[in-house]
Regions:
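Contiguous segments within soluble domain cores/interaction surfaces
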Residues: 1-26, 30-81
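Thiol-/selenol-based redox modules, centered on thioredoxin-like
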Residues: 59-63, 73-78, 182-205
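A Trp-anchored, charged/polar loop motif used as the substrate-binding/catalytic surface
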Residues: 81-98
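Short active-site neighborhood of thiol/selenol oxidoreductases, capturing the structured segment around
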Residues: 98-118
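Loop/turn elements at helix/coil->beta-strand transitions in domains of secreted/extracellular proteins
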Residues: 104-108, 136-141, 169-170, 177
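Second-shell loop/turn segments in exported
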Residues: 112-119, 146, 183-184
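Typically the conserved alpha-helix immediately C-terminal to a functionally engaged Cys/Sec
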Residues: 119-135
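Thioredoxin-like thiol-disulfide oxidoreductase module
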Residues: 143-169, 173-181, 191, 199-202
C-alpha cells in the first residue's frame, strides 16, 4: 500500500502482500489450509499456511448484528498517542470515539496492534486502512489497540476487545450509518476489499 509503517517495513516476517480467496467452510471445527501458487513462469508450488477454525456458535458480532457501542480512546484522552497506538509512525485513526459516531455515519473499526501482533498482519492492515481513509474520507476510521498499556498479555485485553469478544487479531468491522455491521473480516484484507466494504456501508446514508 501507499502507506507503509516502519513496523511493517522493518519486520521481515510481516505480510508484504495480500491475496484474497473466498472459501466456504461448511462445518465447524479446525481446517487445514494449503496455498497453491503459480509464479510468473507458470510453475506451481504449494505451502501449508496457518489453519483456521470455524465455530458453530461464533461469539464475535457478525454481519447484520448491531455493533456494540463502546468508547474508543482518542487523542484528546491521552497525553501521548503512543499510549493508544503501537504503529510507527502512529496511525491517523484516533480522532473519533465510536460511542459518539455509531449510528450517525459509517465506521471502519479496526482492532490491530502493529508492534505486538501475533499473526504478523496487523501492521499491513493498518497501512491498508490508512490508504483507504485517504481515498474515501467520509466514514469514521478508528484504530483500536488490543492490550492495556500495550503489554502483550492475554489477561490484559482492553475492554473494547472484550466487548467484541475477539479471540485473535486483527479484526475489521465496517459498520453502516444505522450502527449495523455490514462487513466483518478476521485477519488480513486488501485495499480492494476494504474499498468495496466502505462503498456498501455508505449506501443509504
Amino acid at each position: 500500500p501507499a502507506f507503509t509503517a516502519e513496523n511493517t517495513a522493518n519486520d521481515p516476517d510481516a505480510a508484504k502482500a495480500v491475496y484474497v480467496a473466498d472459501v466456504v467452510l461448511d462445518k465447524p471445527g479446525p481446517w487445514n489450509v494449503v496455498a497453491l501458487v503459480r509464479d510468473n513462469k507458470g510453475e506451481y508450488s504449494a505451502a501449508r499456511v496457518a489453519g483456521v477454525k470455524a465455530y458453530a456458535d461464533d461469539p464475535v458480532p457478525d454481519k447484520g448484528d448491531k455493533a456494540p457501542r463502546v468508547h474508543t480512546p482518542t487523542l484528546d484522552d491521552v497525553p501521548d498517542v503512543s499510549e493508544i497506538d503501537t504503529r510507527v509512525p502512529p496511525s491517523t485513526m484516533h480522532d473519533e470515539d465510536l460511542a459518539d459516531v455509531l449510528g450517525k455515519k459509517p465506521v471502519v473499526l479496526l482492532f490491530a496492534t502493529p508492534a505486538l501482533c501475533q499473526t504478523r498482519v496487523c501492521g499491513p492492515v493498518v497501512d491498508v486502512a490508512e490508504q483507504v481513509k485517504r481515498d474515501m474520507p467520509g466514514p469514521a476510521y478508528i484504530h483500536m489497540e488490543i492490550y492495556e498499556d500495550n503489554i502483550p498479555d492475554p489477561k490484559k485485553l482492553r475492554d473494547q476487545v472484550r466487548a467484541y469478544k475477539l479471540p485473535t487479531e486483527p479484526w475489521l468491522f465496517v459498520i453502516d450509518c444505522k450502527g449495523v455491521i455490514d462487513t466483518r473480516i478476521e485477519g488480513a484484507f486488501s485495499v480492494s476489499e476494504l474499498t468495496a466494504a466502505v462503498e456498501r456501508a455508505q449506501k443509504g446514508c
